[in-house]
Amino acid sequence: MIIKHDEIEPVEFDKLKIIDCTAGQDNSSSFAEITVPIGVSHKISWSNRSDKYYYISKGNVNFTVNEESYYLSPGDVCIIPKGHRFSYANTGSTEAVLILVHTPSFRLEYEVFVE
């Protein structure tokens, strides 16, 4: 399977730009690129289905996983097991880009978001 980045329509989610490279496919995992503008955060959430692997491609991001905080830079990885609460924020001075892999694949109905 070949996926062309510029053929994917980005979606907006709480000011995050998400390019879901495997949307609608029934794969064992899913892959997305997330652009996090300066000052934008992802609200507290967790998955009842998937482990999440976030690779920091560009910028700096503060992750909080189960109330522990981590400052991540390009090349760092944050692994969030299924059921663990997390959030993240771009508190840096440049846009951040994250690569996200869900295993098994992402299904919105299994994601829980705290308002």
Per-region residue spans from a language model:
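Histidine-centered metal-chelating micro-motifs
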Residues: 41-43, 62, 78, 82-88
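Hydrophobic residues in beta-strands and at strand termini
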Residues: 36-38, 56, 80
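A short, N-terminal "cap"/entry segment at the start of jelly-roll beta-barrel domains
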Residues: 1-29, 43, 113-115
